[in-house]
Amino acid sequence: MPAGDALTKVASFEHQVTGVTVSKDGRIFVNFPRWTEDTEVSVAEVKDGKVVPFPDAAWNSWRNAKKGEVSAKDHWVCVQSVVASPDGNLWVLDPAAPAMGALVPGGAKLVEIDLRTNQPARTIAFDETVAPQGSYLNDVRFSPDGRTAYLTDSGAKGALVVVDLASGKARRVLDGDPSTQADKGVTVTYDGKPLRRPDGRGVEFAADGIALSPDGRTLYWQAIKGKTLYSLPTEALAEGVTTALMPTALADKSLSGKIETVGENGPADGLIISRTNGRMYITSPQDDSIKVRDLSAKGGATATLIKDARLRWPDTFAEGPDGTLYVTTSRIQDSAFYKPDAPAALPTDLWSFKPAAPDATGSTRPAR
């Protein structure tokens, strides 16, 4: 396969994109976290390669300078993820922590948008027992029956969050568990050098990538500053959110004992399990690549599917109705977090590619 043919550019953006999702009828949605005040649109639909504020301009009108004027509970504050649920609606995860800093009171939420009307259907607000200061709710997956949502928190103290969608009740679990924390023994690098902020801190993101098996029985997650992929039966998590008979510390200890180590991915951001072939796809920011894992081979190694210099910090995956996979590039290593002179508006892209063949070893595009 000629270099570069594996990727197709879907859209280009003026700002840093993270999340992407594709609805059952093929509509593409993306989000732009408020990592700089220059972010004008938080959630958008991509139409003919152009960004259209979603559900409307009003929901996208929150600004740091307007905290006292615009309510954080019914406007996008700092959206990190958009995901289409099995029933066809769009869910938007807003950690409400601009620049990954202080959480805006009343802003942390999970919002469902009815794609038949393009109007918000309900909002599940998270209080500080679920999203405390220092948290950064990162990504979300939904059970096939539409009853449960599973979230990662990549903030100062990693955790998972389980939401009962019928009641709106949420519970923070595995808070501080080694599986959800940044791995102190791992240093995230780029171009062969440790990626560090001006104050010397490295990449410290905790539980970030999350994936759910097609049958909904197994949840997978991993920290970016980590190398290990973990899993847990969702049955155990469901017990934790529907009952409050056990103190949190004891419940987490019980859950921790059920966690399995799947294998090592190296530092990774986005995870997805394809409906087409059941394989897990992994974004690898350190080397501009997408990797693939056969989950039936427990403990097996990953294979590099695509290595391409244009995948500058491959971030989040989505799968279209026809099985096409999509991935965003967020260029985190080029952002003001690590380069103080970085422009406020950092161009990024959305790409698509085909699922891996069973024996695929990938294609490469030389660095440039």
Language-model regions, residue ranges each:
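Surface-exposed loop and turn segments in beta-propeller and other repeat-based domains
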Residues: 6-8, 51-74, 118-132, 170-200, ...
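Beta-strand-rich domains and repeat architectures in extracellular enzymes and scaffolds
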Residues: 7-41
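Beta-rich, blade/repeat-based domains predominating
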Residues: 13-25, 68-89, 93, 130-149, ...
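Beta-propeller domains
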Residues: 29-64, 100-105, 109, 113-116
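Conserved beta-strand positions in repeat-built beta-propeller and related beta-rich domains
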Residues: 30-36, 75, 92-95, 151-155, ...
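Beta-propeller blade signature
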Residues: 43-49, 106-118, 163-164, 168, ...
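Short loop/turn segments immediately following beta-strands, especially the blade-tip
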Residues: 116, 165-170, 178, 232-247, ...
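Blade-level signature of beta-propeller repeat domains, shared across WD40, Kelch, NHL, RCC1
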Residues: 318-368
